[in-house]
Curated annotation (Swiss-Prot):
Purpose: Catalyzes the reduction of NADP in the presence of molecular H(2) to yield NADPH.
Enzyme class: oxidoreductase
Keywords for this protein: 2Fe-2S, Iron, Iron-sulfur, Metal-binding, NADP, Oxidoreductase
Protein name stated in the entry: NADP-reducing hydrogenase subunit HndA
Annotated source species: Solidesulfovibrio fructosivorans (Desulfovibrio fructosivorans)
pH dependence (UniProt free text): Optimum pH is 8.
């Protein structure tokens, strides 16, 4: 096992990858090995890793760095830069409320408040049972349906605070 402390810049290592199920790591390795070359595919590999694990904790970032033969700092830089990557687990049913201009003007902030009240969590949090998480996003491109809520891949248009309970009941 490698050191879990930093001796010099670029030498930080985390403990062995024991937190998450090993078959998931094998799936990521197989994906990396299927690439014609590693160079230039870090974002693609991170997307795959996030789809496999659901998020990108430091253990997964280190694993990707090791297998892509790049520094952990480079992986972390990419993960922390792009908003579509997350380092914290999401709920089984992630809720995203569009806060783009059209959605905001039509009451998206009130819809967010209704979800927060119903679930008793704040933006970025996960319910204690792991079922739901709430986040906001910028413009999903369906302005005619504002305000828009996404639960996983399912899109709800013209959502009002009064519909929040009904939406949650579907899950």
């Amino acid at each position: 096992m490698q050191n879990s402390t930093c001796q010099a810049v670029g030498e930080c290592r985390v403990p062995e990858h024991a937190v998450l199920p090993q078959p998931l790591y094998r799936e990521v390795v197989q994906f990396i090995e299927s690439l014609p070359q590693k160079e230039g595919h870090l974002v693609t590999v991170l997307h795959k890793a996030q789809s496999v694990f659901g998020y990108l904790p430091i253990e997964v970032q280190q694993f990707v760095a090791d297998h892509m033969e790049v520094p952990l700092a480079q992986v972390y830089g990419v993960v922390s830069f792009y908003t579509f990557f997350t380092m914290v687990p999401k709920g089984k049913y992630p809720i995203s409320v569009c806060m783009g201009t059209a959605c905001f003007v039509k009451g998206a902030d009130k819809v967010v408040h209704a979800f927060k009240e119903q679930l008793k969590i704040d933006i970025g949090d996960v319910t204690p049972d792991g079922r739901f998480s709430i986040d906001t996003l910028r413009c999903v491109g369906g302005c005619a349906l504002a305000p828009i809520v996404m639960v996983g891949e399912k899109v709800y248009g013209n959502v009002t605070p009064g519909q929040v309970k009904k939406i949650l009941a579907e899950y």
